[in-house]
């Protein structure tokens, strides 16, 4: 995981610094809604925080392990949340566009439609299409 200072900008794109934004969720606070969890997960990918990614993944769909780009070849370039909707009292969907580059290659755009579920007051990533 990358070191940071409290004033570093948050990778998720919100105006708050990392410590006041996604950093608090990476430290164990519960995300208040699915969009915030999705933003915190994006920031975890940027910072290569595998522990948070696995902890925020619903146990029914969580992989046993997650291998990220340990060589640091992937550079995350930005996040654009296109839609976040509650689909039930404890379910939600978030559609977002993330941009990244691998090595010196061209930037890639990835659109994802993610599903989330809340259990015992905590939101979890369920799956995506």
UniProtKB/Swiss-Prot annotation:
Pfam families the record matches: SEC-C (PF02810), YchJ_M-like (PF17775)
Highest taxon, organism lineage: Bacteria
Family: Belongs to the UPF0225 family.
Protein name: UPF0225 protein XCC4159
């Amino acid at each position: 995981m990358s070191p940071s200072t409290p004033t570093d900008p948050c990778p998720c794109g919100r105006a708050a610094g990392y410590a006041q934004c996604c950093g608090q969720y990476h430290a164990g606070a519960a995300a208040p809604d699915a969009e915030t969890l999705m933003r915190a997960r994006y920031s975890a990918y940027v910072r290569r925080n595998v522990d948070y990614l696995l902890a925020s993944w619903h146990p029914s769909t969580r992989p046993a392990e997650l291998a990220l780009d340990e060589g640091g070849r992937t550079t995350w370039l930005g996040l654009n949340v296109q839609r976040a909707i509650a689909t039930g009292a404890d379910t939600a969907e978030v559609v977002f566009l993330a941009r990244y580059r691998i090595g010196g290659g061209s930037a890639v755009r990835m659109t994802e439609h993610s599903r989330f579920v809340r259990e015992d007051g905590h939101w979890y990533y369920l799956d995506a299409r």
